[in-house]
Regions:
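Bacterial N-terminal signal peptides that target proteins for export
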Residues: 1-8
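Bacterial N-terminal signal peptides
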Residues: 8-17
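Sec/Tat signal peptide C-region and signal peptidase I cleavage site
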Residues: 18-22
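Outer-membrane beta-barrel porins/channels
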Residues: 23-46, 87, 91-338
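Short strand-turn segments of transmembrane beta-barrel domains in outer membranes
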Residues: 47-50, 72-82, 319-321
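N-terminal periplasmic accessory domains that precede
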Residues: 57-68
Length: 338
C-alpha cells in the first residue's frame, strides 16, 4: 500500500506542475501532425488516455499498455480535420502468448491538392501540387507482471510538400501500472524522441549568376538552397485513471493526463467514460486546461460495442470536439477486438 501512495503523490505533483505558466514554444518544431489526437474514444475523453489505453489507441498514447488487455485490437479512424484537411489513423495490436503484443500504426494528414500558379500564369499552369504528412510505427509491449507493463515503438516520419520531402526516425516508450485501489491505473509515456526534419528535393536546385556585372564566366551555376532543420515535437505524458463506479451493469471511469510538449506550454486533459452493460458508452472531457489562448476545449462522444459471438466484438465510436474559432471537429472510427 505504501508504494501505491508514492505513485499517487508523484502523479499529483506532476499534474500540479501543469498549472504553472510557461513560455510559449509554438512554431519551434516540425511534424506538428504528431500532436493530433488518435481515436474518437480517447479524444472524447479529452485526450486523457495514457492510463486508459486498453485498445489500439495505446500505440499513440502509451505503448506500455499494449499487452495489458490480453486481446488483439484494430481501429480505423477518419476525421475531417481543420481547413479542409483529412486526418486518418490506423492501429493494429496483435496479442502474442498473453503477455506479449506487437503492433503497427499508420498516421496520415492530407492537405489536399491545389493548382500551381505563377506570376505569369495566375490562373494555373495545368500542374497540381499537394502536401501530405505520414508516420509509420512498429511497436512491442510486454506484461512484466500482472500489474506492470512496458512497451516501445520505432517510427518513420515523413512530410511532403510538392517535390520536397523531410524524413526523420523516432521512438516512443511507455509504462502502465495497475493498483488495487478501485482499479486505479497509472501511465507514463515519452513519444517522438528522434532525429530532426530537413526539407530536400529538386526544387531546391537553382541556377544563379555569382557576379552579374562580370563577363566571360559561367552565368548558370547550379546551386542548392539549404533549408533549416526542425526537431520533432517531443511529448511527455503522465496520467491516472480510476473506476469510481463499478457495479454491473454500470461503470464510470475518470481519467486525467498531464502533458509536457516541447512545442507549447504544459496542459492537463481530463475526461470520463460511462458504460452500460459494456455495450453503450457515453464520454466527455476537456482538453488543454491551463493553456492560455487555446482553441481546444470541450469534447464529447458516444460508442457502441457489438458482439459477434465468442470473443469477437466490433466497436463504433463518434466524437465531437470544440475547436474555438475553427470548425468543430467530428471523428468516427470502426474497430474490432478478438
Amino acid at each position: 500500500m505504501i508504494r501505491y501512495k508514492y505513485f499517487i503523490i508523484v502523479i499529483v505533483l506532476l499534474l500540479s506542475t501543469a498549472t504553472l505558466m510557461g513560455q510559449s514554444k509554438v512554431g519551434t518544431t516540425g511534424a506538428t501532425f504528431l500532436g493530433i489526437s488518435a481515436g474518437p474514444r480517447a479524444t472524447a475523453m479529452g485526450g486523457a488516455f495514457s492510463a486508459m489505453s486498453d485498445d489500439a489507441a495505446a500505440l499513440y498514447y502509451n505503448p506500455g499498455a499494449m499487452a495489458q488487455s490480453g486481446r488483439s485490437h484494430f481501429i480505423f479512424t477518419h476525421t475531417n480535420w481543420l481547413v479542409n484537411t483529412s486526418f486518418n489513423w490506423v492501429g493494429f495490436i496483435l496479442n502474442v502468448g498473453g503477455n506479449n503484443a506487437i503492433g503497427v500504426s499508420v498516421t496520415q494528414l492530407d492537405y489536399g491538392e491545389e493548382q500551381v500558379t505563377t506570376v505569369t500564369q495566375p490562373e494555373g499552369t495545368g500542374d497540381r501540387w499537394a502536401a501530405r504528412d505520414l508516420a509509420l510505427s512498429l511497436s512491442y509491449g510486454r506484461n512484466l507482471t500482472d500489474r506492470f507493463s512496458i512497451g516501445g515503438s520505432a517510427k518513420y516520419i515523413q512530410q511532403r510538400v510538392w517535390n520536397e520531402t523531410a524524413s526523420a526516425f523516432a521512438m516512443d516508450v511507455g509504462l502502465l501500472f495497475l493498483t488495487n485501489f478501485n482499479n486505479m491505473r497509472l501511465g507514463m509515456s515519452i513519444t517522438n524522441f528522434g532525429t530532426e526534419l530537413q526539407m530536400d528535393g529538386k526544387d531546391l536546385f537553382q541556377r544563379i549568376d555569382l557576379d552579374p556585372g562580370a563577363l566571360g564566366h559561367n552565368e548558370t551555376i547550379t546551386a542548392k538552397l539549404k533549408t533549416e532543420s526542425w526537431p520533432l515535437p517531443l511529448f511527455f505524458r503522465v496520467g491516472v485513471a480510476m473506476d469510481v463506479i463499478n457495479a454491473e451493469p454500470y461503470k464510470f471511469t475518470v481519467a486525467a493526463d498531464a502533458l509536457h510538449p516541447t512545442d507549447n506550454s504544459e496542459i492537463v486533459n481530463i475526461g470520463g467514460e460511462f458504460s452500460y452493460s459494456n455495450l453503450l458508452f457515453l464520454r466527455a472531457g476537456y482538453k488543454s486546461l491551463f493553456r492560455q489562448e487555446s482553441e481546444e476545449g470541450l469534447t464529447a462522444g458516444v460508442g457502441i460495442k457489438l458482439y459477434s459471438g465468442g470473443s469477437l466484438f466490433w466497436t463504433l465510436n463518434y466524437t465531437y470536439a470544440d475547436f474555438g474559432l475553427f470548425e468543430d471537429i467530428q471523428m468516427f472510427d470502426l474497430g474490432v477486438s478478438f
